[in-house]
Amino acid sequence: MQVSVENTSALERRMTIAVPAERVENEVNKRLQQTAKRAKVAGFRPGKVPMSVIRQRFEADARQEAFGDLVQASFYEAIVEQKLNPAGAPAVEPKSFEKGKDLEFVAIFEVFPEFAVAGLESISVERLSAEVTDADLDNMLEVLRKQNVRFEAVERAAEKDDQVNIDFVGKIDGEAFAGGSAKGTQLVLGSGRMIPGFEDGLVGAKAGEERVVNVTFPEDYQNLDLAGKAAEFTITVNSVSAPQLPELNEEFFAQFGIKESTLEGFRAEVRKNMERELRQAIKTKVKNQVMDGLLAANPIEVPKALLENEVNRLRVQAVQQFGGNIKPEQLPAELFEEQAKRRVVLGLIVAEVVKQFELKPDEGKVREMIEEMASAYQEPEQVIAWYLKNDQQMNEVRSVVLEEQVVDTVLQKATVTDKSVSYEEAVKPAQAPAEAE
Protein backbone atom coordinates (compact mmCIF):
# COMPACT_ATOMS: atom_id res chain seq x y z
CA MET A 1 0.00 0.00 0.00
CA GLN A 2 1.33 3.40 -0.99
CA VAL A 3 0.64 6.46 1.17
CA SER A 4 1.57 10.10 0.70
CA VAL A 5 0.59 12.97 3.00
CA GLU A 6 0.35 16.67 2.18
CA ASN A 7 -0.02 19.35 4.87
CA THR A 8 -2.60 21.73 3.41
CA SER A 9 -2.81 23.86 6.59
CA ALA A 10 -1.61 23.76 10.17
CA LEU A 11 -4.07 21.00 11.01
CA GLU A 12 -5.50 19.75 7.70
CA ARG A 13 -3.94 16.76 5.95
CA ARG A 14 -4.52 15.50 2.42
CA MET A 15 -3.57 11.84 2.33
CA THR A 16 -3.43 9.86 -0.93
CA ILE A 17 -3.72 6.10 -0.53
CA ALA A 18 -3.22 3.43 -3.19
CA VAL A 19 -4.39 -0.11 -2.39
CA PRO A 20 -2.83 -2.84 -4.61
CA ALA A 21 -5.17 -4.30 -7.23
CA GLU A 22 -4.50 -7.82 -5.94
CA ARG A 23 -5.86 -6.91 -2.50
CA VAL A 24 -8.88 -5.26 -4.10
CA GLU A 25 -9.71 -8.33 -6.22
CA ASN A 26 -9.25 -10.63 -3.21
CA GLU A 27 -11.83 -8.57 -1.30
CA VAL A 28 -14.24 -8.61 -4.24
CA ASN A 29 -13.85 -12.38 -4.71
CA LYS A 30 -14.34 -12.99 -1.00
CA ARG A 31 -17.70 -11.20 -1.15
CA LEU A 32 -18.74 -13.02 -4.31
CA GLN A 33 -17.98 -16.36 -2.65
CA GLN A 34 -20.08 -15.38 0.36
CA THR A 35 -22.88 -14.31 -1.97
CA ALA A 36 -22.72 -17.61 -3.86
CA LYS A 37 -23.54 -19.54 -0.68
CA ARG A 38 -26.85 -17.77 -0.13
CA ALA A 39 -27.88 -16.37 -3.53
CA LYS A 40 -31.22 -17.50 -4.93
CA VAL A 41 -31.19 -17.61 -8.71
CA ALA A 42 -33.98 -19.14 -10.78
CA GLY A 43 -32.96 -22.45 -12.28
CA PHE A 44 -30.26 -23.19 -9.70
CA ARG A 45 -30.26 -24.73 -6.26
CA PRO A 46 -28.97 -22.52 -3.41
CA GLY A 47 -25.19 -22.80 -3.24
CA LYS A 48 -24.95 -24.35 -6.71
CA VAL A 49 -25.08 -21.19 -8.81
CA PRO A 50 -22.05 -21.03 -11.17
CA MET A 51 -19.53 -18.34 -10.24
CA SER A 52 -19.83 -16.86 -13.72
CA VAL A 53 -23.52 -16.18 -13.05
CA ILE A 54 -22.78 -14.85 -9.57
CA ARG A 55 -20.14 -12.53 -10.97
CA GLN A 56 -22.44 -11.32 -13.75
CA ARG A 57 -25.28 -10.47 -11.35
CA PHE A 58 -23.52 -9.41 -8.15
CA GLU A 59 -20.01 -8.22 -8.99
CA ALA A 60 -20.97 -4.52 -9.13
CA ASP A 61 -22.46 -4.65 -5.63
CA ALA A 62 -19.56 -6.71 -4.29
CA ARG A 63 -17.07 -4.24 -5.72
CA GLN A 64 -18.92 -1.31 -4.14
CA GLU A 65 -18.96 -3.05 -0.74
CA ALA A 66 -15.27 -3.86 -1.07
CA PHE A 67 -14.57 -0.22 -1.89
CA GLY A 68 -16.22 0.97 1.32
CA ASP A 69 -14.50 -1.60 3.51
CA LEU A 70 -11.09 -1.11 1.89
CA VAL A 71 -11.27 2.67 2.22
CA GLN A 72 -12.05 2.33 5.91
CA ALA A 73 -9.42 -0.34 6.59
CA SER A 74 -6.64 1.23 4.52
CA PHE A 75 -7.28 4.68 6.00
CA TYR A 76 -6.87 3.27 9.50
CA GLU A 77 -3.69 1.43 8.47
CA ALA A 78 -2.32 4.60 6.88
CA ILE A 79 -2.86 6.88 9.88
CA VAL A 80 -1.20 4.29 12.13
CA GLU A 81 1.72 4.05 9.72
CA GLN A 82 2.03 7.84 9.44
CA LYS A 83 1.44 8.34 13.19
CA LEU A 84 -1.43 10.76 12.60
CA ASN A 85 -4.24 11.49 15.07
CA PRO A 86 -7.41 12.51 13.16
CA ALA A 87 -9.75 14.94 14.89
CA GLY A 88 -12.76 13.81 12.87
CA ALA A 89 -13.98 11.61 10.05
CA PRO A 90 -12.23 12.13 6.69
CA ALA A 91 -13.78 13.44 3.51
CA VAL A 92 -13.05 10.80 0.87
CA GLU A 93 -12.43 11.59 -2.81
CA PRO A 94 -12.19 8.48 -5.06
CA LYS A 95 -9.52 8.73 -7.76
CA SER A 96 -9.40 5.26 -9.29
CA PHE A 97 -11.47 2.14 -8.75
CA GLU A 98 -11.26 0.34 -12.06
CA LYS A 99 -11.23 -3.43 -12.25
CA GLY A 100 -7.71 -4.80 -12.35
CA LYS A 101 -6.14 -1.54 -11.18
CA ASP A 102 -5.08 -0.19 -7.81
CA LEU A 103 -7.77 1.41 -5.68
CA GLU A 104 -6.70 5.02 -5.21
CA PHE A 105 -8.43 7.67 -3.12
CA VAL A 106 -7.74 10.87 -1.24
CA ALA A 107 -8.72 11.35 2.41
CA ILE A 108 -8.91 14.92 3.69
CA PHE A 109 -9.06 15.36 7.45
CA GLU A 110 -7.85 17.41 10.39
CA VAL A 111 -5.45 16.24 13.07
CA PHE A 112 -5.24 17.13 16.73
CA PRO A 113 -2.72 19.90 17.36
CA GLU A 114 0.63 18.75 18.70
CA PHE A 115 1.97 20.93 21.48
CA ALA A 116 3.56 20.84 24.90
CA VAL A 117 1.87 22.79 27.69
CA ALA A 118 4.04 25.77 28.57
CA GLY A 119 4.01 28.93 30.63
CA LEU A 120 2.85 27.39 33.90
CA GLU A 121 5.28 29.60 35.83
CA SER A 122 3.72 32.71 34.27
CA ILE A 123 0.26 31.98 35.69
CA SER A 124 -0.82 34.07 38.68
CA VAL A 125 -3.59 32.88 40.98
CA GLU A 126 -5.30 34.64 43.86
CA ARG A 127 -6.46 32.01 46.32
CA LEU A 128 -9.23 33.21 48.63
CA SER A 129 -9.80 32.10 52.18
CA ALA A 130 -12.86 32.80 54.31
CA GLU A 131 -14.94 31.42 57.14
CA VAL A 132 -18.62 31.31 57.98
CA THR A 133 -19.14 33.72 60.88
CA ASP A 134 -22.14 33.88 63.20
CA ALA A 135 -23.20 37.05 61.38
CA ASP A 136 -23.06 35.22 58.03
CA LEU A 137 -25.17 32.45 59.52
CA ASP A 138 -27.71 34.95 60.88
CA ASN A 139 -27.94 36.59 57.45
CA MET A 140 -28.52 33.23 55.79
CA LEU A 141 -31.33 32.39 58.21
CA GLU A 142 -33.00 35.69 57.32
CA VAL A 143 -32.63 34.87 53.62
CA LEU A 144 -34.28 31.49 54.20
CA ARG A 145 -37.12 33.13 56.12
CA LYS A 146 -37.67 35.69 53.34
CA GLN A 147 -37.74 32.92 50.75
CA ASN A 148 -40.67 31.43 52.66
CA VAL A 149 -42.47 34.69 53.41
CA ARG A 150 -46.28 34.80 53.56
CA PHE A 151 -48.38 37.91 52.95
CA GLU A 152 -51.40 38.92 55.02
CA ALA A 153 -53.87 41.66 54.07
CA VAL A 154 -53.57 44.90 56.05
CA GLU A 155 -55.70 48.05 56.30
CA ARG A 156 -52.97 50.64 55.83
CA ALA A 157 -50.94 52.40 53.18
CA ALA A 158 -48.51 50.28 51.18
CA GLU A 159 -44.86 50.28 52.23
CA LYS A 160 -41.68 48.95 50.67
CA ASP A 161 -41.62 45.12 50.79
CA ASP A 162 -45.44 44.98 50.92
CA GLN A 163 -47.30 43.02 48.27
CA VAL A 164 -50.01 44.84 46.35
CA ASN A 165 -52.64 43.39 44.04
CA ILE A 166 -53.20 45.80 41.16
CA ASP A 167 -54.96 46.43 37.86
CA PHE A 168 -53.20 48.79 35.48
CA VAL A 169 -53.46 50.33 32.03
CA GLY A 170 -50.43 51.88 30.37
CA LYS A 171 -50.57 54.51 27.63
CA ILE A 172 -48.03 56.24 25.41
CA ASP A 173 -49.15 59.53 23.88
CA GLY A 174 -52.66 58.74 25.11
CA GLU A 175 -52.83 55.36 23.35
CA ALA A 176 -52.80 51.98 25.12
CA PHE A 177 -49.93 49.74 23.96
CA ALA A 178 -49.53 45.98 23.70
CA GLY A 179 -48.46 44.37 26.97
CA GLY A 180 -49.12 47.55 28.94
CA SER A 181 -52.27 46.41 30.74
CA ALA A 182 -53.08 43.67 33.27
CA LYS A 183 -55.55 42.76 36.00
CA GLY A 184 -54.94 41.08 39.36
CA THR A 185 -51.16 41.37 39.22
CA GLN A 186 -49.34 40.58 42.48
CA LEU A 187 -46.36 42.90 42.95
CA VAL A 188 -43.89 43.21 45.84
CA LEU A 189 -42.86 46.86 46.15
CA GLY A 190 -39.11 47.21 45.89
CA SER A 191 -38.64 43.93 44.02
CA GLY A 192 -37.51 45.74 40.87
CA ARG A 193 -39.84 43.63 38.77
CA MET A 194 -41.36 46.65 37.02
CA ILE A 195 -39.59 49.50 35.22
CA PRO A 196 -38.03 52.24 37.38
CA GLY A 197 -40.61 54.54 39.00
CA PHE A 198 -43.58 52.17 38.73
CA GLU A 199 -43.19 50.53 42.15
CA ASP A 200 -42.10 53.75 43.85
CA GLY A 201 -45.32 55.36 42.64
CA LEU A 202 -47.38 52.89 44.67
CA VAL A 203 -45.70 53.45 48.03
CA GLY A 204 -48.30 55.06 50.30
CA ALA A 205 -51.29 53.85 48.28
CA LYS A 206 -54.22 52.13 49.99
CA ALA A 207 -56.63 49.42 48.87
CA GLY A 208 -59.27 50.90 46.56
CA GLU A 209 -57.10 53.86 45.59
CA GLU A 210 -56.36 54.78 41.97
CA ARG A 211 -53.05 56.36 41.07
CA VAL A 212 -51.52 57.75 37.89
CA VAL A 213 -47.78 57.05 37.63
CA ASN A 214 -45.58 58.57 34.93
CA VAL A 215 -42.46 56.64 33.95
CA THR A 216 -39.93 56.40 31.13
CA PHE A 217 -38.89 53.07 29.67
CA PRO A 218 -35.10 52.50 29.87
CA GLU A 219 -33.10 53.11 26.69
CA ASP A 220 -31.95 49.47 26.78
CA TYR A 221 -35.46 48.06 27.33
CA GLN A 222 -35.90 44.65 25.69
CA ASN A 223 -38.89 45.81 23.62
CA LEU A 224 -37.25 48.28 21.23
CA ASP A 225 -40.64 49.80 20.34
CA LEU A 226 -40.95 51.03 23.94
CA ALA A 227 -37.30 51.81 24.74
CA GLY A 228 -36.77 55.41 25.84
CA LYS A 229 -40.45 56.35 25.62
CA ALA A 230 -42.50 58.12 28.32
CA ALA A 231 -45.60 56.27 29.52
CA GLU A 232 -48.52 56.93 31.85
CA PHE A 233 -49.93 54.11 33.96
CA THR A 234 -53.35 54.30 35.61
CA ILE A 235 -53.15 51.86 38.52
CA THR A 236 -55.92 50.59 40.78
CA VAL A 237 -54.79 49.06 44.07
CA ASN A 238 -57.05 46.12 44.94
CA SER A 239 -55.34 45.08 48.17
CA VAL A 240 -52.26 45.64 50.31
CA SER A 241 -50.57 42.75 52.14
CA ALA A 242 -47.69 42.89 54.61
CA PRO A 243 -44.90 40.29 54.71
CA GLN A 244 -45.01 37.79 57.57
CA LEU A 245 -41.73 35.97 58.11
CA PRO A 246 -42.05 32.40 59.43
CA GLU A 247 -40.89 31.54 62.92
CA LEU A 248 -37.69 29.52 63.31
CA ASN A 249 -39.42 26.43 64.62
CA GLU A 250 -39.65 22.71 63.91
CA GLU A 251 -42.26 23.22 61.17
CA PHE A 252 -39.94 25.67 59.40
CA PHE A 253 -36.92 23.35 59.76
CA ALA A 254 -38.87 20.47 58.21
CA GLN A 255 -39.37 22.45 54.98
CA PHE A 256 -35.65 21.99 54.31
CA GLY A 257 -35.67 18.26 54.99
CA ILE A 258 -33.84 18.77 58.28
CA LYS A 259 -35.05 16.63 61.16
CA GLU A 260 -33.53 18.83 63.85
CA SER A 261 -36.10 20.13 66.32
CA THR A 262 -33.91 22.79 67.92
CA LEU A 263 -32.65 26.10 66.61
CA GLU A 264 -29.10 25.14 67.54
CA GLY A 265 -29.31 21.95 65.50
CA PHE A 266 -30.81 23.79 62.53
CA ARG A 267 -28.09 26.45 62.67
CA ALA A 268 -25.46 23.70 62.71
CA GLU A 269 -26.95 22.10 59.58
CA VAL A 270 -27.18 25.42 57.75
CA ARG A 271 -23.60 26.28 58.73
CA LYS A 272 -22.42 22.93 57.38
CA ASN A 273 -24.14 23.62 54.06
CA MET A 274 -22.67 27.13 53.92
CA GLU A 275 -19.18 25.78 54.58
CA ARG A 276 -19.62 23.23 51.80
CA GLU A 277 -20.76 26.00 49.45
CA LEU A 278 -17.79 28.13 50.53
CA ARG A 279 -15.27 25.36 49.81
CA GLN A 280 -16.77 24.78 46.38
CA ALA A 281 -16.84 28.51 45.54
CA ILE A 282 -13.19 28.99 46.47
CA LYS A 283 -12.21 25.89 44.52
CA THR A 284 -14.16 27.10 41.47
CA LYS A 285 -12.54 30.54 41.50
CA VAL A 286 -9.07 29.04 41.72
CA LYS A 287 -9.90 26.66 38.88
CA ASN A 288 -11.20 29.51 36.71
CA GLN A 289 -7.96 31.45 37.17
CA VAL A 290 -5.87 28.38 36.37
CA MET A 291 -7.87 27.65 33.23
CA ASP A 292 -7.68 31.29 32.11
CA GLY A 293 -3.93 31.17 32.67
CA LEU A 294 -3.54 27.97 30.67
CA LEU A 295 -5.53 29.50 27.81
CA ALA A 296 -3.43 32.67 27.78
CA ALA A 297 -0.13 30.77 27.91
CA ASN A 298 -1.06 28.14 25.32
CA PRO A 299 -2.75 29.60 22.23
CA ILE A 300 -3.51 26.65 19.98
CA GLU A 301 -5.45 26.19 16.78
CA VAL A 302 -8.71 24.27 17.08
CA PRO A 303 -9.75 21.55 14.62
CA LYS A 304 -12.92 22.67 12.87
CA ALA A 305 -14.47 19.25 13.35
CA LEU A 306 -14.13 19.47 17.14
CA LEU A 307 -15.48 23.01 17.16
CA GLU A 308 -18.52 22.03 15.07
CA ASN A 309 -19.22 19.05 17.31
CA GLU A 310 -19.06 21.23 20.43
CA VAL A 311 -21.30 23.88 18.88
CA ASN A 312 -23.86 21.17 18.12
CA ARG A 313 -23.66 19.88 21.68
CA LEU A 314 -24.27 23.37 23.04
CA ARG A 315 -27.22 23.81 20.68
CA VAL A 316 -28.82 20.63 22.00
CA GLN A 317 -28.18 21.70 25.60
CA ALA A 318 -29.77 25.10 24.93
CA VAL A 319 -32.92 23.52 23.49
CA GLN A 320 -33.14 21.09 26.42
CA GLN A 321 -32.69 23.92 28.92
CA PHE A 322 -35.04 26.49 27.43
CA GLY A 323 -37.50 24.21 25.67
CA GLY A 324 -39.71 25.45 22.88
CA ASN A 325 -40.44 23.94 19.49
CA ILE A 326 -37.16 24.99 17.95
CA LYS A 327 -34.72 22.44 16.53
CA PRO A 328 -31.06 22.64 17.64
CA GLU A 329 -29.81 23.24 14.09
CA GLN A 330 -32.05 26.31 13.81
CA LEU A 331 -30.01 28.12 16.47
CA PRO A 332 -27.24 30.27 14.89
CA ALA A 333 -23.83 28.66 15.31
CA GLU A 334 -22.20 32.01 16.10
CA LEU A 335 -24.15 32.14 19.37
CA PHE A 336 -22.08 29.25 20.66
CA GLU A 337 -18.74 29.49 18.86
CA GLU A 338 -16.87 31.44 21.54
CA GLN A 339 -17.96 29.13 24.34
CA ALA A 340 -17.39 26.06 22.18
CA LYS A 341 -13.85 27.16 21.31
CA ARG A 342 -13.03 27.76 24.98
CA ARG A 343 -14.30 24.33 25.94
CA VAL A 344 -12.46 22.56 23.13
CA VAL A 345 -9.16 24.35 23.72
CA LEU A 346 -9.33 23.76 27.47
CA GLY A 347 -10.14 20.12 26.86
CA LEU A 348 -7.04 19.74 24.67
CA ILE A 349 -4.81 21.60 27.13
CA VAL A 350 -6.08 19.67 30.16
CA ALA A 351 -5.57 16.38 28.30
CA GLU A 352 -2.01 17.41 27.47
CA VAL A 353 -1.27 18.31 31.11
CA VAL A 354 -2.55 14.87 32.11
CA LYS A 355 -0.27 13.29 29.50
CA GLN A 356 2.82 15.41 30.26
CA PHE A 357 2.65 14.90 34.01
CA GLU A 358 1.38 11.30 33.77
CA LEU A 359 -1.63 12.01 35.98
CA LYS A 360 -4.16 9.38 36.98
CA PRO A 361 -7.31 9.79 39.09
CA ASP A 362 -6.47 9.51 42.79
CA GLU A 363 -8.99 6.94 44.05
CA GLY A 364 -8.72 8.35 47.57
CA LYS A 365 -9.81 11.76 46.29
CA VAL A 366 -12.55 10.10 44.27
CA ARG A 367 -13.93 8.61 47.48
CA GLU A 368 -13.61 11.97 49.28
CA MET A 369 -15.54 13.74 46.53
CA ILE A 370 -18.33 11.18 46.62
CA GLU A 371 -18.60 11.52 50.40
CA GLU A 372 -18.64 15.32 50.10
CA MET A 373 -21.50 15.21 47.59
CA ALA A 374 -23.35 12.59 49.63
CA SER A 375 -23.16 14.72 52.78
CA ALA A 376 -25.76 17.07 51.25
CA TYR A 377 -28.39 14.29 51.43
CA GLN A 378 -30.37 12.87 54.33
CA GLU A 379 -29.10 9.33 53.71
CA PRO A 380 -25.46 9.82 52.65
CA GLU A 381 -24.56 6.13 52.90
CA GLN A 382 -27.22 5.26 50.33
CA VAL A 383 -25.87 7.92 47.97
CA ILE A 384 -22.32 6.61 48.37
CA ALA A 385 -23.47 3.05 47.68
CA TRP A 386 -25.31 4.23 44.55
CA TYR A 387 -22.17 5.87 43.20
CA LEU A 388 -19.96 2.87 43.96
CA LYS A 389 -22.16 0.49 41.96
CA ASN A 390 -22.69 2.88 39.02
CA ASP A 391 -19.70 2.73 36.66
CA GLN A 392 -20.79 5.70 34.56
CA GLN A 393 -21.20 7.96 37.58
CA MET A 394 -17.89 6.79 39.03
CA ASN A 395 -16.10 7.62 35.78
CA GLU A 396 -17.67 11.08 35.78
CA VAL A 397 -16.38 11.67 39.31
CA ARG A 398 -12.93 10.40 38.27
CA SER A 399 -12.93 12.94 35.42
CA VAL A 400 -13.70 15.77 37.84
CA VAL A 401 -11.01 14.58 40.26
CA LEU A 402 -8.49 14.32 37.43
CA GLU A 403 -9.28 17.90 36.42
CA GLU A 404 -8.73 18.99 40.03
CA GLN A 405 -5.37 17.22 39.96
CA VAL A 406 -4.52 19.22 36.83
CA VAL A 407 -5.33 22.40 38.77
CA ASP A 408 -3.17 21.25 41.68
CA THR A 409 -0.30 20.48 39.30
CA VAL A 410 -0.47 23.97 37.79
CA LEU A 411 -0.68 25.58 41.24
CA GLN A 412 2.61 23.93 42.19
CA LYS A 413 4.33 25.93 39.44
CA ALA A 414 2.18 29.08 39.32
CA THR A 415 2.51 32.19 41.48
CA VAL A 416 -0.15 31.88 44.17
CA THR A 417 -1.21 34.76 46.43
CA ASP A 418 -3.45 34.04 49.40
CA LYS A 419 -6.14 36.58 50.29
CA SER A 420 -8.55 36.57 53.23
CA VAL A 421 -12.06 37.80 52.37
CA SER A 422 -15.58 37.72 53.76
CA TYR A 423 -17.95 34.83 53.17
CA GLU A 424 -20.12 36.97 50.88
CA GLU A 425 -17.18 37.95 48.69
CA ALA A 426 -15.88 34.40 48.53
CA VAL A 427 -19.19 32.89 47.39
CA LYS A 428 -19.95 35.67 44.91
CA PRO A 429 -20.30 33.97 41.50
CA ALA A 430 -17.16 33.93 39.40
CA GLN A 431 -17.20 36.12 36.29
CA ALA A 432 -16.41 33.39 33.77
CA PRO A 433 -16.86 29.70 34.54
CA ALA A 434 -14.02 27.46 33.45
CA GLU A 435 -15.04 24.63 31.17
CA ALA A 436 -12.96 21.77 29.94
CA GLU A 437 -14.35 18.89 28.02
Curated annotation (Swiss-Prot):
Q: Where in the cell is it found?
A: Cytoplasm
User: Which UniProt keywords are listed?
Assistant: Cell cycle, Cell division, Chaperone, Cytoplasm, Isomerase, Rotamase
Disulfide bond positions: none
Q: Which SUPFAM superfamilies match?
A: FKBP-like (SSF54534), Triger factor/SurA peptide-binding domain-like (SSF109998), Trigger factor ribosome-binding domain (SSF102735)
One CC-aspect GO term:
cytoplasm
Give the PPIase FKBP-type domain ranges.
161-246
One MF annotation (Gene Ontology) recorded for this entry:
protein folding chaperone
Where does it mainly reside? Answer: cytoplasm
Enzyme Commission identifier(s): 5.2.1.8
Gene Ontology BP terms: 'de novo' cotranslational protein folding; cell division; chaperone-mediated protein folding; protein transport; protein unfolding
Q: Which reaction does it catalyse?
A: [protein]-peptidylproline (omega=180) = [protein]-peptidylproline (omega=0)
Q: Which protein family is it in?
A: Belongs to the FKBP-type PPIase family. Tig subfamily.
Quote the entry's note on domains: Consists of 3 domains; the N-terminus binds the ribosome, the middle domain has PPIase activity, while the C-terminus has intrinsic chaperone activity on its own.
* Job of this protein: Involved in protein export. Acts as a chaperone by maintaining the newly synthesized protein in an open conformation. Functions as a peptidyl-prolyl cis-trans isomerase.
UniProt-recorded name of the protein: Trigger factor
